[in-house]
Amino acid sequence: MISNLEIKNYKSINQMELNCSRINVFIGEPNSGKSNILEALDLSFLSWMMHINEVNKKVNTELIDLKSFFRVNKVADMFHLGNFNSPISITHPGFSAGTNIEYIQDKEKDINLFEFNNSNGSFTNFDSDFIPQDPLQFYATPIKPYRYKSNIQFHDTGNYIQRLMAPFGNNLAKVIYHNTDMQQLAKEFAKEHGFDLNIDNANDNITLQLRINEGIVYSLSYEALADTYKRILFYSAAVKHTNARVITLDEPDTHAFPPYVSYLAEEITKQKEVQFFIATHNPYLLNSLIENSPADQLSVFVVSYDRLNRTTVTKKLSDNDLSELLDFGVDIFFNLNRYSNDSIEYPS
């Protein structure tokens, strides 16, 4: 487990140190830098995502748009205030090799490159568009990001089978097919709406079917399914069926019906062997995690942007703060200033 995390020179973060728990939740106003904290951890998976793309090119399957994933137009946008003089550095002593990204000049080829390297001495060079350069070297990591996409191309390139493929879960159909708990979850949701679940294992496809009469079946493709349904399947698989030791989830509660948000929170608390880093704006998710997590296994950080020092900062809530949220029903999302700088704000 990551006990201590240090991030330097990444996007809005100049320098940040966090004392982490098994479940780490980041809350704060939009554009405060919550997602940047998750992305900093995701950088350790960057080399492997490049590997996934190289494999997918050969079999003509969906590529990961790395610019979109990291929300940049070019690699240079990842450096804090465009500072190339210092590398991007993510360290977590005692857990796994740290990650560095630094700017380098290839004088022989007269091109500017970036080098992904870790404390084990491994490296991958790539250009400003995230295109890896020879020699191609890629490295796996125990940290995996999971990000929901409404429309994905199902495939199991890499033969993950029972474990959900990061970052988008392209093998979700296989995961449901090979795990009875996922089958049950999918079937129950379909049954509530009068449909039957159909998994086409040969073609990696998910549909819901409604029997009209003998020999007549109406089918709904995965793309046409309700967003809440697709999200709960994806995030349930990510939480329960991963080989990662650490996973990051960015607003897994978006567009989700409150009972499903509470269900997801309960599943997160049950996975004792996995560490979570989660950004959220959802009081249902936050309160469910506080209610169901032992105090020593949960950390909640209020994230804000320090305009004076031009950096994202965090404040970890105390046990008393968390008790107050539950005991008095305080909606922290209307009182963020109270917990970050002791002032109180109310909704208008």
Residue ranges, per PLM feature:
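Phosphate-coordinating catalytic segments in nucleotide- and nucleic-acid-processing enzymes
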Residues: L46-V246, D306-S348
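Switch/communication elements of ASCE P-loop NTPase nucleotide-binding domains
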Residues: M1-M50, I216-S348
